Structures are given as C-alpha cells and as structure tokens.
C-alpha cells in the first residue's frame, strides 16, 4: 500500500501509471477528493487513518480495506450504514500494541470483546486481520517484539474464534523487514 496522504491526485496518477494500484489515505475528505479527481476505477483505496464514529457513513463501503477499526462504537456506526445500503466492508482491527494513551487502537486485553461484538452484531463487517503502529517509529529491529505480539494476538483470535484473519498490517519503510519476519 502506497501512502498517498498530502500528495496531490496528479502524483497518485503518476505512481499508478507504473502499476501501483493500492493507495492508503489517512483522511476521509482527502481520500474522497482524490477519488473524485481521478478517473482510475482500478485503484484500490485503503483507509489507514483513525475514523471517528461520526465519519462512518463517509467510510462505509468506500474503501477496499479499513485498517483502523478500533471500537464497538465505530463498528456499530459502520454497521448501521452498511446495513442500510446492504453492502459489506472488510476491516482490520487496529491494536494499540504499545498501550500508548496518545495512539488510537483497541487495547490488547479488550481485543476479544471487540471481535466478539463484531461477529455477533455486525454481519456486514468482515474481519480480515489486525493492524498496529509500534511505539518505536521506523526503529528497525526495535519494533520486532511489537510485531511478534500482534502476530501472537492474531493467532489466539484464530484459535478462539475460528477465524482465518489472513492479514497483518504492520511495519513501515524503516522496519518492514522485521514486520515480514514475523
């Protein structure tokens, strides 16, 4: 996923001309503006930024993957819109893997409750895996324990909820090798 936040639509178009089709945006309004400017229906847009519950109607069903599902409140807001339009939305649950107050994401100990809620009450949301941003930004190997912890959490959910959860979204340019290793 190429992160295109703060880059103009012309840059997205240029990168897409080289074969890149997956683009990640942090802000709903910026993503929608670029999508409207570009006549490129084959692009796959990812929402990688925090989504407030009140913005759920603008997100629901508009992205190939929502990387930042982080609360029961947001899952309910998404489900309401998805149900009214009879469409689905694939999502990753964002886990606050470092337990940092300033970061978004569900705390690891609350993760099973969120999964249980989505499975029981949000039939239009399809859980595909987990996402995290480690507390050490672009720190190479120092991020690896956080990636390992996310993988273990995913493995526990697979076992306890009988879910495939094939995706782990973790790592950026400075630590992606360690994310892949996990």
Question: Which residues are covered by each model-predicted region?
Answer:
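Conserved alpha/beta-domain cores
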Residues: 1-174
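Non-catalytic positions within long, well-ordered alpha-helices that form the structural scaffold/packing
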Residues: 16, 180-181
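Hydrophobic residues within well-ordered alpha-helices
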Residues: 59, 179-180
């Amino acid at each position: 996923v190429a992160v295109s936040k703060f880059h103009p639509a012309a840059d997205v178009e240029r990168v897409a001309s080289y074969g890149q089709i997956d683009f990640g945006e942090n802000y709903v309004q910026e993503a929608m503006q670029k999508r409207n400017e570009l006549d490129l229906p084959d692009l796959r847009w990812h929402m990688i930024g925090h989504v407030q519950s009140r913005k759920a109607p603008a997100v629901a069903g508009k992205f190939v993957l929502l990387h930042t599902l982080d609360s029961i409140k947001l899952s309910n807001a998404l489900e309401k819109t998805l149900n009214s339009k009879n469409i689905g939305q694939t999502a990753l649950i964002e886990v606050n893997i470092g337990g940092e107050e300033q970061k978004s994401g569900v705390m690891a100990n609350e993760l099973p409750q969120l999964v249980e809620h989505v499975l029981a009450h949000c039939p239009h949301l399809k859980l595909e895996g987990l996402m995290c941003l480690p507390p050490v930004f672009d720190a190479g190997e120092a991020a690896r324990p956080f990636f390992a912890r996310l993988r273990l959490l995913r493995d526990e959910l697979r076992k306890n909820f009988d879910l495939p959860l094939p995706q782990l979204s973790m790592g950026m340019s400075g630590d992606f090798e360690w994310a892949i290793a996990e």
